[in-house]
Amino acid sequence: VNSRAEKFAGVDGAKGAWVVAVFDGSRLTWTGCSSVAEVLEHTRDCARVGVDMPLSLPVDGYRISELEAKAFLGRARSSIFHTPVVDVLDASTYEQACALSRSITGKAISKQTWHILPAVQAWREADFDPDIYVEVHPECSFRAMSPTTPFASKKSGRGVGQRLAALGRLSEHLDLGDLPDGPVVDDFLDAAAAAWSARRFHVGEHRTFGTADASDRIVA
């Protein structure tokens, strides 16, 4: 199989919608999708797809994959916030979610976590192959992509430049002149990094945090 001829995608959440980056072996392009169903339709011919969203939830405690990924990130560990326990998905208010989380883990959840719960739930309800759609964390991907780069915040100009330079090794053709309207620049960069990890997973060059199967796995 010639992996250069195959397509790989990366998916990143963008304020209630999704950015999908597709790498076809030479060119990297981006598309906006309004739902998980649309993401699945857009990526159905891709060999592997990296998703920057928790695809497994713990029953109690923390996921091993996140603990290992935090250790890998070092000073950038705060870019990973812990996935809540599955019972929290039943909460209808932030206060209720915090109470449920405290009763099981002893800790509340962050507002940031609360705001991504609808997206987490959307992926839980979706029908996809967990060996094709794999969870990734873009900051882990960028550090695996360029281990010697001291990445600045992705919100800074320096950080954007560093990530673009790293992605340039994946593709010389970054279609930055025709990005979908709406998402901010780091959403596009994160989706591209997710596509990079999807390709790595496909060819067996990836790094795994957590389990070898999809039960608690992040790949980079």
Go through each PLM region and give its residues.
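RNase H-like (RuvC/DEDD) metal-dependent nuclease/polynucleotide-processing core
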Residues: N2-A220
